[in-house]
């Protein structure tokens, strides 16, 4: 019973934090959203990559939550009661999340060559992760 609770809590917290994680780069950049949210004044206070520190740490937290959400039910051993397709989809989403974390680490380097391509991959990976997590929640939530 405790494993189900921990798995459920970490999964739903991660779902909410994924949405926040996606919003943070847009909040820390001067645009219509940051003006509307009144965060635009902070958007020019430091270099963009330095302002993104909450985005970085939230990404690390999402990795930890994803691993906990994966390991706890595996150790409990009650996986047969869940939709196996949803579990495989969640496995692919976790692997993409690990790749996303690696790309995020590279993107923190201000001297990175090919930043535009890496940011594009970073964007499309989160799109894929959100899609896979949504299907996982639909099948197993």
Annotate each language-model stretch with its function.
Residues 1-141:
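Membrane-embedded alpha-helical bundles that constitute the cytochrome b-like, heme-associated redox core
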């Amino acid at each position: 019973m405790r494993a189900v609770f921990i798995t459920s809590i970490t999964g739903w917290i991660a779902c909410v934090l994924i949405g926040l994680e996606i919003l943070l780069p847009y909040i820390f950049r001067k645009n219509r959203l940051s003006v509307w949210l009144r965060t635009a004044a902070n958007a020019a206070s430091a270099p963009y990559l330095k302002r993104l520190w909450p985005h970085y740490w939230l990404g690390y937290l999402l990795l930890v939550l994803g691993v906990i959400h994966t390991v706890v039910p595996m150790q409990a051993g009650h996986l047969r009661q869940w939709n196996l397709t949803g579990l495989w989809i969640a496995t692919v989403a976790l692997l993409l999340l690990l790749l996303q974390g690696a790309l995020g680490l590279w993107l923190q380097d201000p001297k990175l060559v090919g930043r535009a391509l890496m940011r594009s991959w970073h964007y499309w990976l989160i799109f894929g992760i959100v899609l896979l997590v949504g299907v996982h929640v639909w099948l197993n939530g």
